[in-house]
Amino acid sequence: MFGSDNRADYDNGFPWHPHRGIETITYQIKGKTFHEDSEGHRGIIAPGEIQWMTAGSGIFHEEMPKPIYYGEENKYRERNDSNAGIQLWLNMPASSKMADPAYRSIRSDQIPQISDDYGNRIRIVAGTVNRVSGALNENFQYDLMQRIDPYYVEILMEPDTRTSLSVPEGHRAIMAIVEGSIRVNGSTFNEKNVAVLSKEGTDIFIDSQANSRLIFLAGKPLNEPIAWYGPIVMNTRDQLIQAFNELQEGKFVKNRNPVWQ
């Protein structure tokens, strides 16, 4: 999670850096973040929007949550008074780690939203809830979706209400409490806590104790070795060494024409 109301904390942003072997999923809650990558793609992530980037074989990018002057009409001239969001790293299977990079921009109005009996709002970025498919499932089907079957669901709860979800069979799941306080199957979790949930297809009952914002994340485990250092996640130490050698030699980016979606 990233978030601050102090401009000095986020004006520096996240300057140019590499990734390989993962997908980065950035969800903007407050403020705006400017993204640009080594393939020439650029855009603004506004509140309620998602950027789902496949680093694959290698990409450089920067994420700059600061005042932005973008385009001839200066459409984004306003200054951000605060900035908050969540970035998730999704490990790619060994067979996909050297895939071509891709960039997916998901607008807020592309994310399906449903309400439960208490009026709690459930936004479905990926996965299926109450037979409603998420934005990623509807707009961006690709091979990795079938392998991992990711769930990315935001829940906005009113105080003293209840909602429920099911952990899909065979999935590992966590729930991040971004704001508020909740009880999950009888256990209390507060702001910035993370609840690790069962992988046995169980139902989860969530009781809110305040206005709460939750992120439910789930996926099928890969059961593969992980070799991780800094922004690069591979399967073996030799692959990591190769990646950092390629960084020094200027050979890191393999594909200059990634998929823009």
UniProtKB/Swiss-Prot annotation:
Entry EC no(s): 1.13.11.24
Catalytically driven reaction(s): quercetin + O2 = 2-(3,4-dihydroxybenzoyloxy)-4,6-dihydroxybenzoate + CO
Enzyme class: oxidoreductase
InterPro entries: Pirin, Pirin_C_dom, Pirin_N_dom, RmlC-like_jellyroll, RmlC_Cupin_sf
Cofactor binding mode and count: Binds 1 divalent metal cation.
Binding-site residues, a divalent metal cation: H17, H19, H61, E63
Requisite cofactors: a divalent metal cation
Positions of disulphide bridges: none
Domain of life: Archaea
Keyword field: Dioxygenase, Metal-binding, Oxidoreductase
Single GO term (MF): quercetin 2,3-dioxygenase activity
Pathway participation: Flavonoid metabolism; quercetin degradation
Family assignment from sequence similarity: Belongs to the pirin family.
Entry function: Putative quercetin 2,3-dioxygenase.
Name of this chain's protein: Putative quercetin 2,3-dioxygenase Ta0133
